[in-house]
Amino acid sequence: DNILYSGETLSPGEFLNNGRYVFIMQEDCNLVLYDVDKPIWATNTGGLDRRCHLSMQSDGNLVVYSPRNNPIWASNTGGENGNYVCVLQKDRNVVIYGTARWATGTNIH
């Protein structure tokens, strides 16, 4: 899957995958985007702790937490509560999208 929804987490070793690209929460607390085997972006939090997790929060902030729930990295995109998604796109970019502003209202409950 290539989407992390509000309220969801990535535990150590879990990842978003979109073909050749992988966005992984590593065991060493580093969040890394890989193009095949080549790291192309990272939070540079490796070695700060072990077994951290990534959280897509309902305020739109993407945060790496230590096992004691201390934030060690954040996207600093927190705002109003809503529905947000973190998407690993086909163009290799990882993007946080926010709450929908309009809909037809024709969804089925």
Swiss-Prot record:
Keywords: Antiviral protein, Disulfide bond, Lectin, Mannose-binding, Plant defense, Secreted. A two enzyme-linked immunosorbent assay (ELISA) (with NPL bound to the solid phase and a Galanthus nivalis lectin (GNL) as detector) can be used for the quantitation of human immunodeficiency virus type 1 (HIV-1) coded glycoprotein (gpl20), and possibly the quantitation of free gpl20 in medium/sera, and screening for compounds and antibodies which interact with gpl20. When labeled with fluorescein isothiocyanate (FITC), can be used for the detection of very early stages of apoptosis, especially UV-B-induced apoptosis. Gene3D superfamilies: Bulb-type lectin domain (2.90.10.10). Detected in bulbs (at protein level). Alpha-D-mannopyranose binds at residues 26, 28, 30, 34, 37-38, 41-42, 44, 57, 59, 61, 65, 72-73, 76, 83, 89, 91, 93, 97, 102. Strongly inhibited by alpha-1,6-linked mannotriose. Inhibited by various oligosaccharides of P.pastoris mannan including, Man(alpha-l,6)Man-alpha-O-Me, Man(alpha-l,2)Man, Man(alpha-l,3)Man-alpha-O-Me, Man(alpha-l,2)Man, alpha-1,2-linked mannotriose, and Man(alpha-1,6)Glc, in order of decreasing potency. Weakly inhibited by elsinotetraose. Not inhibited by maltose or nigerose. Disulfide bonds join C29-C52. D-mannose-binding lectin which binds alpha-D-linked mannose. Displays a high affinity for alpha-(1-6)-mannose oligomers. Able to interact with both terminal and internal alpha-D-mannosyl residues. Displays antiviral activity and therefore may contribute to defense against infections. This is Mannose-specific lectin. It comes from Narcissus pseudonarcissus.
